[in-house]
């Protein structure tokens, strides 16, 4: 979504500091007491025994005999091969790796890196599908960016982040960028970080603005966040500044060593920032850029994050897939908002694949000369994995099954009714599969989903918490209560 201007915010008043009396430590303590966290699942003994113990120092797991897609051009792909996970890392990839580790039968599976989402406002998790017919302006800005955002307490941020992060894991997304423009107060920011941490997903926390008011300390509170929660470079959570076009904000990001993630759906807005643009910036949407701006992004080494379903549905403009390809700008996929679209990456891959090909076919029918090549299914799966890791500044750590990288791995069921018999691995992923095919998910070597079930969260408890939070926000926003015609008038 586009950043919200001051005129699009409404003051929220005093922050609710009681929830986080001592920042993230308060949330963690509450979670331990069962007040904020969702209790781990206690599976039956047989199921528990079947879940591999992995991700810890010295723990090894061998994924045996799968179709292995590495996203690493030096390694290539394998019709049948093994992946060895040791601790949090990928130790080896190849056919017939020696035994010596607990073995998981990956036959009938596609083994690949997890998907990487480069822009999602996950604080809105409990508001899924609430604005299905909405435009960006005025609907989203008014109903979500103002009414809902003003109503959120820190605990609502926590629940939204936790729910959306687990939803991402369930869909095979092992890394996401949380574009968190809900920093109404430092407590809200700490709640977002804690929700990400408690989910166990790999994430870039994009510290963004929030509802205007005396407790909003954006962007300066990023210094405290850096010290308190992001002092280590090798943790699951890393820090970015989610911002707009104020050069002073960019300076603060560079001061604390945080990359920049930026909504840009205007025309000409980047020109005053030309000298500040660099490879540490990822630009979102970009449906209306000038030719000069495209050149600036390309020359400065920036990346793109496209949310094509949202851009088409909500009125941002035509997703600039071909402009990115023409300018050789690395691009990636993002879900943006679950208020309108599903949280999976199969939807994202299909939408972008179909849209680019439709546009190229139209140019061919118009007898245009020198028509660009069509995207392939392999292209779009690469964009959804290593392309996302690059746009999230994490491609040295994740996004491919390169030995030495973090073991962010998914196993996709290739013998399921919707894709059997398997004839084309990339085609099955991009065109045939959905979340039901995500059989297992590893994040930093730890099992987060196993045999189709999430591991480490009580889904029923999480649902109850999400419903209570949703009901509170709806009551505060004074929306009608109905699931038939929508909570919001006209939706």
Model-inferred region functions:
Residues 406-463:
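C-terminal cap of metal-dependent C-N hydrolases
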Residues 52, 182-294:
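Metal-coordinating catalytic core of metallo-dependent amide/deamination hydrolases
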Residues 1-15:
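N-terminal secretory signal peptides
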Residues 23, 48-62, 68-113:
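Histidine-rich, glycine-flanked metal-binding segment
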Residues 126-157, 267-280, 300-303, 351-375:
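Active-site gating loops and adjacent loop-to-helix segments of metal-dependent hydrolytic enzymes
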Residues 128-201, 220-232, 467-469:
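Alpha-helical scaffold segments that flank or form the walls of functional sites
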Residues 321-416, 432:
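His/Asp/Glu-enriched, well-ordered alpha-helical/loop segment
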């Amino acid at each position: 979504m586009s950043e919200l201007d001051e005129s699009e915010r409404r003051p929220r008043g005093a922050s609710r500091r009681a929830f986080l009396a001592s920042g993230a430590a308060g949330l963690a303590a509450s979670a331990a007491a069962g007040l904020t966290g969702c209790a781990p699942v206690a599976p039956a003994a047989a199921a528990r025994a079947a879940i591999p113990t992995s991700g810890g120092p010295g723990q090894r797991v061998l994924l045996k005999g799968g179709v292995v897609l590495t996203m690493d051009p030096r390694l290539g792909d394998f019709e049948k091969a093994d992946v060895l996970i040791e601790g949090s890392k990928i130790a080896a990839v190849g056919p017939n790796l020696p035994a010596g580790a607990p073995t998981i039968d990956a036959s009938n599976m596609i083994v690949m890196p997890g998907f990487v989402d480069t822009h999602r406002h996950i604080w809105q998790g409990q508001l899924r599908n609430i604005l299905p017919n909405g435009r960006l302006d005025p609907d989203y800005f008014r109903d979500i960016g103002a009414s809902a955002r003003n109503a959120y307490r820190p605990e609502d941020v926590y629940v939204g982040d936790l729910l959306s992060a687990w939803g991402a894991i369930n869909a095979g997304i092992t890394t996401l960028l949380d574009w968190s423009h809900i920093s109404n107060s430092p407590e809200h920011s700490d709640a977002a970080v804690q929700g990400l941490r408690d989910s166990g997903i790999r994430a870039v926390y994009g510290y963004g603005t929030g509802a205007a008011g005396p407790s909003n300390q954006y962007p300066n509170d990023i210094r405290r966040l850096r010290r308190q929660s992001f002092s280590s470079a090798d943790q699951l959570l890393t820090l970015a500044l989610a911002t707009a076009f104020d050069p002073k904000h960019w300076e603060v990001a560079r001061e604390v060593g945080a990359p920049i993630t930026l909504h840009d759906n205007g025309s000409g807005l980047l020109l005053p920032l030309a000298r500040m643009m660099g490879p540490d910036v990822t630009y979102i949407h970009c449906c209306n850029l000038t030719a000069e701006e495209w050149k600036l992004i390309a020359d400065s080494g920036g990346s793109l994050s496209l949310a094509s379903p949202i851009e088409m549905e909500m009125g941002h403009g035509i997703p600039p897939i071909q402009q990115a390809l023409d300018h050789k700008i690395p691009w990636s996929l993002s879900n943006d908002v679950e208020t309108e679209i599903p949280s999976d990456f199969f939807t994202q891959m299909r939408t972008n694949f179909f849209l680019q090909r439709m546009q190229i076919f139209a140019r061919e029918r118009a007898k245009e000369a020198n028509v660009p090549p069509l995207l392939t299914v392999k292209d779009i799966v690469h964009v959804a994995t290593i392309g996302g890791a690059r746009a999230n500044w994490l491609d040295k750590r994740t996004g491919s099954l390169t030995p030495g990288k973090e073991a962010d791995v998914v196993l996709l069921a290739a013998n399921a009714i919707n894709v059997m018999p398997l004839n084309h691995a990339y085609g099955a992923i991009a065109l045939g599969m959905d979340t039901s095919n995500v059989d297992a998910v590893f994040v930093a070597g730890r099992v987060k989903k196993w045999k189709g079930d999430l591991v480490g969260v009580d889904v029923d408890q999480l649902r109850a918490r999400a419903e209570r939070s949703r009901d509170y926000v709806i009551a505060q926003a004074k929306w009608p209560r109905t699931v038939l015609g929508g909570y919001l008038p006209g939706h």
